[in-house]
Amino acid sequence: MNKQVKNNDIDNNKINAIIELKNKKFDGINDRIEFIKLLLGDNNLNSMVDFDMCDTEHVENRTNGFDIRKIMEKKYMDFNKLICDIGGKLLYIKSGTTGHTFKGIIYDNDGTSEILNYAIKVVAYPIRENYGDVNDVKRPENAELMMLRVLSYFVVNAQTPHIVLPIGTFNTSIKPFIALAKNKIVENKKYDQFIKRYKQSEYHDDVSILISEWANGGDLLDYIKNNYKKMKLRDWRTLFFQIISVLCVIQNKYPGFRHNDLKANNILVQNIDLRKKNNYYLYKLHLANERYDFLVPNIGIQIKIWDFDFACIPGIVENSKVNSDWTDKINVKPVQNRYYDLHYFFNTLTMKGFFPEFWDCKEIHHQVKQFVRDIVPEQYSKVNTDSNENQFVTNRGRILINTEYTYPEKILLENPFFNKMRPTAAKAID
């Protein structure tokens, strides 16, 4: 059940500025950055992204520092006061395995029309010996913040729009969120489990708060389930290009980057306007040390990858979860494998619990199915059984070998599925 949990006043001048910005539809990166600056205003919450610095090295944690409060200036703040400063209402959306999502809603001066949204992710800190103190930068809750900060510079530098931009983060007391269930403002089984675990002393008394952009189209899995019957070949091609291109951009800078949980419900969807003319985007990608251009249709949505609490870049963003003994069994480790995320997305997409109708669905073009089979051949899509001696894949779809069967750059350069997006025989459009 979704219920509004807070209602705050907001300065009329700020509302008018937001309305003016909303008319730009947030399709462009500059508009997204302007929104973050406007939302933060002059409150005490620091921006996670320094928009005046445009290099990833600026935020790489290459020192021996382990305290997130010093590396990112993550403060302890009063949640209610901070949200009051930002303004608007909060609406509970859902609970996942590791976090709980709220939607921030800012209304117009009359309080009737919704003009802007932001996302709030609330994450409890499990008490585990190998995770350390709540301020340890290697904890998965803090590693996610570090990863978002590093990757955000690919967006700031206009190399890709396909990453959720973080806004701010802080620690706060867990008690206001415990009270939500008590007051029946939130009614959800996973949220109830969160309350139960806290009462059993499995969580610290603080929670981590992440404020970020809001994606207005839900997640990609729901989008596909709701729209697959009317999706054309160009729609599938564009979606897959967006996903593969953002992995390519990241891996070209950080070949050791691994998301480790890149499934369709960890990819968010932003609805964007369809233009009447020139309804294409020009992607300028550096592949094999040269620039290649791709003309990508605007299909009315833009994906953004999200949920980085399992992610790592060895030597830059370390993650205690990735370094755990149990993750070795599912081949999640701080070792370069540019195929891992690619495989996990496409393999899980067609599995039970996701979109198993994919292979038998007559509405899906045969070229789309062939492309997925090119990325995940049958020997790497087989689900293990007790009698299966060739165990390449876990029963949840994770590949168990570290061979880079293929990788994003190779696919964009060579796979004929994307030939229509290559505008000319030349490498780049001047």
Enumerate the language-model features and the residues they cover.
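Compositionally biased low-complexity segments enriched in polar/charged residues
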Residues: 1-13, 54, 58, 62, ...
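Helical subdomain adjoining the active site within ATP-dependent kinase catalytic cores
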Residues: 11-49, 320, 329-430
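ATP-binding glycine-rich phosphate-binding loop
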Residues: 56-114
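ATP-binding glycine-rich loop module of kinase domains
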Residues: 104-164
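Conserved kinase catalytic-core helix
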Residues: 151, 227-259, 264, 274
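Conserved structural core of kinase catalytic domains
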Residues: 161-233
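Catalytic activation segment of kinase domains across protein kinase-like and atypical kinase folds
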Residues: 256-336
